Every structure is written in C-alpha cells, then in structure tokens.
Amino acid sequence: MLTIADRSFQSHLIMGTGGASSFDTLEKSLIASGTELTTVAMRRHAAHTGAHGESVFELMQRLNITPLPNTAGCRTARDAILTAQLAREALDTSWIKVEVIADDTTLLPDVLELIDATETLTNDGFTVLAYTSDDPVVAQRLEDAGAAAVMPLGSPIGTGLGILNPHNIELICSRATVPVLLDAGIGTASDATLAMELGCSGVLLASAINRCINPITMATAMKHAVEAGRLAREAGRIPRREHAVASSSFEGLASWADEVL
C-alpha cells in the first residue's frame, strides 16, 4: 500500500499523461499499468482529445484514477503557486505536484524556488508532492517545508538514462519520514525495479511508457517491475561479498578417490 498524506493506493506506480501518442493509447496504457494516481499538467484550458470530446480529467474519472495536477513548466515559485491555486479551483483538489524548472535545456529543478513554493502552498492547505534533485539535503529541506512526498529525479526528464546516482536515492530514502517517489529519467522496467529496491515508496513515469514503441506492453512491464522491486526490498537482498560462497554443502560429496579405495 502506498500512503501519501491521508490517502492510500494499492499501486505504487504513478503515471504521467504527457507525450502520449493518442487518447486511445493513453487510456489503454493507464489500464495496463494499474495506476491509481496520474499526473496532468495544468494549462489555461483542458484539451479534449477523446473520440467524443472527452477530456483527460473525464477519462480518469471514468477509470477511477485520482488526478494529480502538476505545475510543469513553471519557472518561479510565484507561477507554481498561482498554477496550484487554479488547479484547486478547477478540479476541487488540494493535491499538487510542484515542479519549478531552472531552464528549458536541462529541465532540472530550481530548488530554491521549489522550497519557497512548497512552504507557501503547504501553509495554504495544499498536499504538496515536490519534484526535486537527487540531493539528500534538499530533500530534507522540502520535508521540513511541509512536503507530503519528495520526488527526486533519477536523471533529467525524458532522457531515459535511469538512476544515475543510486547512492543518493538510497540515502534520501533512508532519511525521509515521508514517501519518496522516484520521478524522471526512467527508461525501462529494470530502472523502476531498481528504484523500489533502493527504498522508494513509488515510481512516477511518463515518457518511458508514452514514448516507447509499444506503450501498452511497457505499461504492463512497469506494473510488474515496480511490484518486483517492492517485494525484493521487503525480502532483503543477500550481502555483497568479495569472495564466492557455495550454496551447496560439500558434506557427502562423492569423489573418485573414495570409489577407488
């Protein structure tokens, strides 16, 4: 069970809607992934791209998926705060994924603006899920500012490079008292599994599904990958060793010398 603030979800996979090739493919991918929480970028108008003019928000309502509006594209805390307020009024939700981007080339978080936005929105009654860098100190500052979940990147958005700094992700997980959701950079199922093995509570991804060759098949793979990583973490991996350790006992082993005698 993934618990964030006052809500719980069976699935530990959060899916994004950005980059989907078609409305129909998005719908089938959402179903295949098993996600119960899905991010949508807030804009001044909602795109109606379904066959019958159905919006993404109406699709999620039909599929019983909780929408998580985000502030994608915002460059300042002020813009992120305004976008969150518009989302609350439009969607009647106080949940918001806060992104404050430093520049359009790297799409890396501006952590100073992010912390400012997180604190202000938390004080205004929002449940903030904060997209951040893989810096453990920044993650702690966001938690101190009131974030209900911290969302460190594995690698820059859309790169598919996987988790470039697993040590830092594991360190963030070990120190956090709120859920840690790996966000950005996932390229394939093994990346999602690793995130959960490192101790993440969940994984958010969009491009890895929406921009791959077969999104529906990849959505299914990601569903199982996240669950596999979670179970592996709970089971506990064997310790790493410098030397080989036999898995079978040598007691009673037949040898040629014994047979000759």
Curated annotation (Swiss-Prot):
Location of this chain's protein in the cell: Cytoplasm
GO BP annotation list: thiamine diphosphate biosynthetic process
Highest rank taxon of the organism: Bacteria
Any one GO CC term of the record: cytoplasm
InterPro entries in UniProt: Aldolase_TIM, Thiazole_synthase_ThiG, ThiG
Active site as annotated: K97
EC number(s) per entry: 2.8.1.10
Pathway membership, UniProt: Cofactor biosynthesis; thiamine diphosphate biosynthesis
Calcium in keyword set: no
A Pfam family per the record: ThiG
Gene3D superfamilies: Aldolase class I (3.20.20.70)
Keyword ATP-binding carried by entry: no
HAMAP family in UniProt: ThiG
Assembly description: Homotetramer. Forms heterodimers with either ThiH or ThiS.
Family: Belongs to the ThiG family.
Function of the protein: Catalyzes the rearrangement of 1-deoxy-D-xylulose 5-phosphate (DXP) to produce the thiazole phosphate moiety of thiamine. Sulfur is provided by the thiocarboxylate moiety of the carrier protein ThiS. In vitro, sulfur can be provided by H(2)S.
Protein name in the entry: Thiazole synthase
Source organism: Corynebacterium diphtheriae (strain ATCC 700971 / NCTC 13129 / Biotype gravis)
